[in-house]
Amino acid sequence: MLLANTAAAVLLLIVCIGASVGLPTVDEENVVQAEQLPILPTADSSKPTDDTVKAIAPQPRYLLPADFAVKNKKFTIGTLGVGSFFRAWRNCIDEGKGLATIESEKEQKYLESLLKASSTGSNYWIGATNIGASNTNKLTWITTDLPVQTKPPFLNVVAKSTCIALTPTGSWTLRNCLNPLNIFPYICEEYF
């Protein structure tokens, strides 16, 4: 049963990563600015004709950061038990949230205090992983597919299939995503 669940989780991850690889990334070079759009002549330059509208090819859509227009983030300890990294990711989704991303020192400090106060003595999954990365030392947030920019400088990720958990003191620790013995509670985030 555990092997079947692990295989299903790996298959789900491969499908999700495959889908996200096909999306172009957002950076200043590939975002079309308004002044770059072609200006086509029309019979009456105050309003475009149907031919003008058809002549302007639709621009590709880009994946924008998940917090594009969001003001506040709230962290919660997952309520659906413990599990593997992929189960934690799925559980957060089932709770209507995402697996936690840490995007500032302030968020890191908050989570450290939250975990110290919980005193469970357990690690907690967050959304950082190198699965799907071309360089094993590059982590991305599984929730947003954006690069992790808050990685502690001492953290040296060298193995493939690495996921990050927070220790009971809030420090980052490396864990093999595919090891069935790595079963932890998890931290979710939600925006409001």
Curated annotation (Swiss-Prot):
Single biological process term from Gene Ontology: immune response
GO molecular function: carbohydrate binding; pattern recognition receptor activity
Signal peptide: 1-22
Keywords: Disulfide bond, Lectin, Signal
Protein name (Swiss-Prot/TrEMBL): Protein A16
Organism: Anopheles gambiae
InterPro entries for this protein: C-type_lectin-like, C-type_lectin-like/link_sf, CTDL_fold
Expressed in which tissues: Expressed in the gut of adults.
